[in-house]
Curated annotation (Swiss-Prot):
Record organism: African swine fever virus (strain Badajoz 1971 Vero-adapted)
Coiled coil region boundaries: none
Alphabetic keyword roster: Early protein, Host cytoplasm, Host-virus interaction, Inhibition of host innate immune response by virus, Inhibition of host interferon signaling pathway by virus, Inhibition of host STAT1 by virus, Inhibition of host STAT2 by virus, Interferon antiviral system evasion, Viral immunoevasion
Family, as annotated: Belongs to the asfivirus MGF 360 family.
A Gene Ontology cellular-component term: host cell cytoplasm
Subunit structure: Interacts with host STAT1; this interaction mediates STAT1 degradation through apoptosis. Interacts with host STAT2; this interaction mediates STAT2 degradation through the proteasome.
Name of the protein: Protein MGF 360-9L
Amino acid sequence: MDMDEMLRWACRKNYNYLTIYYCCVALGADINQAMFHSIQFYNIGNIFFCIDLGANAFEEGKTLAHQKDNSFIASMLSLNCYSMNDSLSLKETDPEVIKRMLKDYHSKNLSIAHKHYINDGFNDI
């Protein structure tokens, strides 16, 4: 199985952080591609995990979301307020250390999107 296929399989299951992290950080898979796969499978947790890891292809992601008739995801990706989560180490390759690091992980960018949705909704984006 090639790396992109492995990444695609990893992104099918929502909240599959350990496998996505390992594919992107340890094996060198493209984090933006992981975000695109997650958009295709409508896995919001994975989408925001990818953003936390540094995915930044928001325009392409919005286009893909619209193609998949996912206006909610496209609206979330339209917010211009996301950034990489510096608390996630991008150098760790030991699966046990990664597992411990991600044990209590909560996406800072998903929290931002959630607060925006609660306060303003996504209709005006």
